[in-house]
């Protein structure tokens, strides 16, 4: 699959494909609205998103309580069918596929903030794409840095995301591979196909007291390590001003260690 050049129109599909759009920022987030509207120019789009923000929930699935799946006309999607779910991003994809029919593509985002390196392990945005992949559907996750003023302009990112999604609909993706796409904080210099790099967080816990003297805790994190100087990685590419497109394979086996580990295992 070829990543489209920003100056070259994408190939036209023979019929309007069906695209399921999800996110982790919630149904009212500006990124999913911009993405859904951009995709609707060439696809039949349906939006299924959490009713409240679900950032950093990872690939959680709700199994201990029922889920509510409600149509909403208040999220600003115009004629695009939009549904809110009181669950996780992965729940949204599961319900969207099973209740509304299998789409041709699952798209997640555009996330408020990047998802780079180890972020992929706890990102609800990426988890929605992973859930699409586990259901046998080509899937893409989109995330974006804020600009230097701390603001988000999703219009240009949504336009490129739409073109990339259309290319994937035309060409497909290899089995068990999704695309994780990150937009830089500046006007992009171009597009880079990248490796998932290093973006390590040091977890910290802030403890405070409520008015009754009881402790409560905030779990936070500080970015402590990254490979921002290596433009072949996702973090390095966006730091250099490029759109990062990382092919991510859903294969957790360290195959290069199977032989060595087999020899090292103690006998039963």
Curated annotation (Swiss-Prot):
UniProt-listed PANTHER family: 5'-NUCLEOTIDASE SURE (PTHR30457), 5'_3'-NUCLEOTIDASE SURE (PTHR30457:SF12)
Keyword Cytoplasm included in the entry's annotation: yes
Keywords: Cytoplasm, Hydrolase, Metal-binding, Nucleotide-binding
Positions in coiled-coil regions: none
Xref: Gene3D superfamilies: Survival protein SurE-like phosphatase/nucleotidase
HAMAP family: SurE (MF_00060)
Subcellular location: Cytoplasm
Protein task: Nucleotidase that shows phosphatase activity on nucleoside 5'-monophosphates.
Free-text cofactor note: Binds 1 divalent metal cation per subunit.
SUPFAM superfamilies attached to this UniProt entry: SurE-like
EC number from the UniProt entry: 3.1.3.5
The name this protein goes by in its record: 5'-nucleotidase SurE
Gene Ontology molecular function, alphabetical: 3'-nucleotidase activity; 5'-nucleotidase activity; exopolyphosphatase activity; metal ion binding; nucleotide binding
Predominant location: cytoplasm
Organism name: Deinococcus radiodurans (strain ATCC 13939 / DSM 20539 / JCM 16871 / CCUG 27074 / LMG 4051 / NBRC 15346 / NCIMB 9279 / VKM B-1422 / R1)
Family as reported in the entry's similarity comment: Belongs to the SurE nucleotidase family.
Species classification: Bacteria, Thermotogati, Deinococcota, Deinococci, Deinococcales
Origin: domain of life: Bacteria
Gene designation per UniProt: surE
Keyword check for Hydrolase: yes
Reactions catalysed, as given in the entry: a ribonucleoside 5'-phosphate + H2O = a ribonucleoside + phosphate
Binding site for a divalent metal cation: 24-25, 55, 111
Top-rank EC class of the record's enzyme: hydrolase
One GO CC annotation: cytoplasm
């Amino acid at each position: 699959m070829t990543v489209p050049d920003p100056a070259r129109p994408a190939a036209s599909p023979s019929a309007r494909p069906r695209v399921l759009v999800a996110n982790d920022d919630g149904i009212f987030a500006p990124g999913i609205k911009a993405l859904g509207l951009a995709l609707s120019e060439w696809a039949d789009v349906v939006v299924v998103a959490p009713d409240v923000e679900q950032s950093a929930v990872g690939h959680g699935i709700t199994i201990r309580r029922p889920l509510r799946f409600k149509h909403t006309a208040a999220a600003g999607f115009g004629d695009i069918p939009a549904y809110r779910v009181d669950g996780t991003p992965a729940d949204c994809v599961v319900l969207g596929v099973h209740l509304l029919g299998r789409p041709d593509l699952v798209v997640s985002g555009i996330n408020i903030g990047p998802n780079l390196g180890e972020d992929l392990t706890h990102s609800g945005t990426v988890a929605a794409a992973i859930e699409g992949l586990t259901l046998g559907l080509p899937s893409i996750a989109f995330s974006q840095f804020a600009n230097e003023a701390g603001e988000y302009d999703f219009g240009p990112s949504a336009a490129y995301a739409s073109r990339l999604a259309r290319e994937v609909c035309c060409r497909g993706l290899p089995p068990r591979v999704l695309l994780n796409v990150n937009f830089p904080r500046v006007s992009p210099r171009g597009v880079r196909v990248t490796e998932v790099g290093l973006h390590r967080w040091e977890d910290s816990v802030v403890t405070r007291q409520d008015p009754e003297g009881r402790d409560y805790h905030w779990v936070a994190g500080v970015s402590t390590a990254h490979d921002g100087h290596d433009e072949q990685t996702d973090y390095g590419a966006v730091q250099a001003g490029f759109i990062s497109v990382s092919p991510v394979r859903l294969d957790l086996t360290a195959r290069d260690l199977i032989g060595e580990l087999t020899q090292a295992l103690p006998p039963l």
